[in-house]
C-alpha cells in the first residue's frame, strides 16, 4: 500500500511528490521517503525477484505523478503500437519488455491500473478505491482499523528532498496503515481482482455450474437479428436501449419550497432485494426469440414463465395524479435525465407542441420510439395515456426465479451476523453484482502524453471487452425503479398536499409523520422492506440530487440535529462551508438554489509534474 503527498502552495506552476509512504499489506513497518525517484527505486527493489501489486487509494490522483514521471524519463517507454487500420493498442502486461509500461484509463477517465516491467517482473499499480469506494477516514471507522486517519495543513512550502516533520510522517504513515489493514481484511474475504464488481462476478461465477452459466447467460452479441426489421444488429443492441438507471425525481411544483415534519424511507439493499426470490421477480435467461407484430402473444404475458422486451412507437401524456418516470436522453427534443410528463415538445414560450418542424423543414408529430422491459411497459400503461401507440416488435426469454439466491443469501447472512469490516465487505458484495451484469463490449481507453511537461490524453475507441448479460442487467434496474415508483405513488396526494416530494433510486422523501407513510413494509434489515432512515423538521429539494434535510432522528432515535446536505458536484469542503453558514444564520435554506456560490471546491488540474487540486468556488448552475 502506498501514498503520495504532493506540493500545494500559492501561485504554483509545478507540482511534485514531497513525501511518500508504503508498507506491505498487514505490516506495521512503513517506509517513508521524500521524492518520487526514491519511490520508484523502492518499488524496483521490491520487484527484483517477484511480481508485485502496489495499491494507491485514488490512483487517478497519485497515478498522474507516476505517469508524468515515467513519460519524462528515457529509462521507461510507453508500450503502445498501431495496427494496420491506424488504431492504437497497448501491449498486454505479459508482453511487456523491461522498461516498458502500460495502463488502463477508460474513455470516461476512470483509472484502473499502471503496469511496469522491470528485472523481468511486473510492478502493477492499482486503485484500492475501486475495491473500497470510500474515504480513508470512513474505511478506518467502518473497518475499526488499529490506526485511524489524522490530518495536517496541506498548504505550505514543501518540496522534494525537504525535511519531513514527525507530525507529517505520522500523518502519511497512518494513511497507508489504515488502507493496508483494510485491504488485508478484504482479501481474506475476496479475490484479488481490480474492482469490487469483478470480485463480485468472480464469486458469483464460482457458485454457478459452467453448463448452467453458458445456458442461462449466452453472449447477446452472438445473436444476430435483421437490422431492417428490428433496427438493431444483435440482441444486445436491441435490449440495451431498455437499460436505464435509478428513478430520481422532485415533484414538479414542490421544488425550492420549505417542507416541515418529514421522513425519509430507504429500501434495505434495493438491488439485492429485487434480485432475491423473496421479491417474486423472475429473470430472463437463455436466447431470445424475436417477433414482429402489434400485439404480444398471450402466452408470453405469463411472467412466471417468460420475460419480454418490447419496442413501441407512441405519444404519451401523464395521467392525472400519476408520477412521471419516462426519461429520453440523447434527443434535442427533451431535457436529459428528466422524467417526462409528455412526449410533446416544450417550445421557447413553455408551451407543449404536438408537432415540430425538423431541420429539413418537414412537419412531424412528437411520437417517440421506446424500447422497454415488460416491467416498464406495464408501468407506462399505468401512468400514461398512450396515443397512436403501436407495438413494433418484441423479444421473449424464458424466465427463472432465484438465480441469485445462493450468492445473495451468503452475503445477506454475513451482513446480518457480523459487525465491522466483515459486515462492510458483505454490503459491498450485495450491492455491486448487479451493475456488472450490464457490462458492454466498450473498452475505449485513453493514451497519455506530455505537452510542455503537462499530462494530456487522447481517446482511442475500442470494443473488445467481453460483455455480460444485458437482459438481466436491464431487468434488475427496471424492477428496482418500479418498486420505488409504486411506493412513491402510494404517498403522492397532489402537488398542494402533504406527501411524497422526492425520490432518489432507493429512497422516498415525504413531509408526513412516520405513521402516515403508506404502502411500504417497515423492517430494519429484511429484503424488500424499508427503514425510516431519518426524520427531519425542515427540508428543501431543489432538483435531482440537490437537497437539504435538517435531521432530528436516525433510524427512529433522536440525534443532535444536523443539516444533511446532498448536492451533486459539491465538495466536502463546500458543504462544510455552507453548513457553517446555515448554523451561523449567514444563510438560510432558501439560499440553497440555482445561482448559489460557495467556497471550498477542489478542482483537479493537470500541471507540470502531476495533478494539483485548485481551490475554487462551487456554483449550482441552471440545468442544461
Task: Annotate each predicted stretch with a short phrase.
Residues 10-58, 64-624:
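Conserved acidic
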Residues 3-10:
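Ser/Thr-glycine-rich phosphate-binding loops at phosphate-binding pockets of nucleotides
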Residues 1-3, 17:
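Glycine-rich short-loop/terminal segments
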Amino acid at each position: 500500500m502506498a501514498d503520495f503527498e504532493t506540493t500545494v502552495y500559492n501561485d504554483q506552476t509545478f507540482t511534485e511528490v514531497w513525501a511518500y509512504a508504503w508498507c506491505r499489506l498487514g505490516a506495521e513497518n512503513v517506509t517513508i521517503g521524500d521524492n518520487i525517484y526514491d519511490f520508484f527505486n523502492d518499488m524496483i527493489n521490491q520487484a527484483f525477484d517477484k511480481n508485485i501489486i502496489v495499491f494507491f487509494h485514488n490512483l487517478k490522483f497519485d497515478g498522474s505523478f507516476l505517469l508524468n514521471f515515467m513519460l519524462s524519463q528515457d529509462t521507461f517507454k510507453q508500450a503502445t503500437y498501431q495496427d494496420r487500420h491506424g488504431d492504437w493498442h497497448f501491449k498486454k502486461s505479459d508482453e511487456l519488455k523491461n522498461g516498458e509500461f502500460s495502463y488502463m484509463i477508460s474513455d470516461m477517465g476512470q483509472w484502473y491500473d499502471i503496469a511496469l516491467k522491470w528485472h523481468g517482473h511486473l510492478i502493477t499499480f492499482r486503485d484500492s478505491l475501486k475495491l473500497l469506494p470510500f474515504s480513508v477516514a470512513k474505511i478506518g471507522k467502518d473497518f475499526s482499523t488499529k490506526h485511524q486517519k489524522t490530518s495536517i495543513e496541506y498548504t505550505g512550502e514543501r518540496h522534494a528532498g525537504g525535511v519531513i516533520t514527525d507530525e507529517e510522517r505520522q500523518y502519511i504513515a497512518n494513511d497507508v496503515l489504515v488502507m493496508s489493514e483494510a485491504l488485508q481484511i478484504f482479501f481474506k474475504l475476496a479475490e484479488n481482482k481490480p474492482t469490487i464488481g469483478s470480485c463480485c462476478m468472480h464469486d458469483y461465477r464460482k457458485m454457478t455450474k459452467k453448463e448452467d452459466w453458458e445456458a442461462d447467460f449466452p453472449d447477446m452479441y452472438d445473436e444476430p437479428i435483421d437490422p431492417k426489421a428490428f433496427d438493431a444488429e444483435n440482441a444486445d443492441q436491441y435490449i440495451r436501449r431498455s437499460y436505464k438507471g435509478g428513478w430520481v425525481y422532485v415533484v414538479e411544483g414542490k421544488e425550492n419550497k420549505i417542507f416541515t415534519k418529514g421522513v425519509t424511507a430507504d429500501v434495505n439493499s434495493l438491488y439485492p432485494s429485487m434480485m432475491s426470490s423473496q421479491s417474486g421477480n423472475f429473470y430472463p435467461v437463455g436466447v431470445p426469440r424475436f417477433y414482429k407484430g402489434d400485439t404480444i402473444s398471450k402466452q408470453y404475458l405469463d411472467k412466471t414463465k417468460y420475460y419480454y422486451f418490447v419496442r413501441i412507437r407512441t405519444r404519451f401524456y401523464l395521467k392525472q395524479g400519476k408520477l412521471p418516470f419516462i426519461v429520453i436522453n440523447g434527443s434535442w427534443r427533451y431535457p436529459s435525465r428528466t422524467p417526462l410528463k409528455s412526449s410533446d415538445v416544450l417550445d421557447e414560450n413553455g408551451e407543449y407542441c404536438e408537432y415540430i418542424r425538423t431541420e429539413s423543414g418537414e412537419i412531424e408529430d412528437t411520437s417517440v420510439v421506446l424500447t422497454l422491459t415488460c416491467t416498464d411497459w406495464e408501468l407506462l400503461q399505468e401512468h400514461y395515456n398512450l396515443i397512436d401507440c403501436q407495438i413494433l416488435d418484441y423479444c421473449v426469454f424464458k424466465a427463472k426465479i432465484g438465480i441469485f439466491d445462493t450468492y445473495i443469501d451468503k452475503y445477506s447472512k454475513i451482513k446480518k451476523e457480523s459487525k465491522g469490516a466483515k459486515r462492510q465487505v458483505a454490503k459491498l458484495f450485495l450491492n455491486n453484482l448487479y451493475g456488472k451484469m450490464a457490462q458492454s463490449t466498450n473498452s475505449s481507453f485513453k493514451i497519455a502524453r506530455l505537452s510542455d511537461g503537462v499530462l494530456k490524453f487522447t481517446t482511442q475507441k475500442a470494443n473488445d471487452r467481453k460483455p455480460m448479460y444485458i437482459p438481466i442487467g436491464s431487468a434488475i434496474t427496471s424492477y428496482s425503479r418500479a418498486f420505488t415508483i409504486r411506493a412513491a405513488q402510494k404517498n403522492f396526494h397532489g402537488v398542494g398536499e402533504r406527501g411524497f416530494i422526492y425520490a432518489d433510486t432507493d429512497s422516498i422523501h415525504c413531509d408526513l409523520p412516520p405513521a402516515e407513510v403508506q404502502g411500504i413494509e417497515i423492517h430494519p434489515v429484511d429484503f424488500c422492506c424499508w427503514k425510516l432512515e431519518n426524520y427531519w423538521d425542515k427540508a428543501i429539494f431543489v432538483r435531482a440530487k440537490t437537497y437539504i434535510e435538517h435531521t432530528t432522528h436516525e433510524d427512529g432515535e433522536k440525534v443532535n440535529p444536523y443539516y444533511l446536505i446532498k448536492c451533486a458536484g459539491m465538495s466536502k469542503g463546500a458543504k462544510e462551508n455552507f453548513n457553517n453558514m446555515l448554523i451561523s444564520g449567514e444563510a438560510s435554506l432558501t439560499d440553497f438554489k440555482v445561482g448559489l456560490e460557495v467556497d471550498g471546491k477542489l478542482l483537479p488540474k493537470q500541471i507540470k509534474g502531476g495533478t494539483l487540486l485548485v481551490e475554487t468556488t462551487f456554483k449550482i448552475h441552471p440545468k442544461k
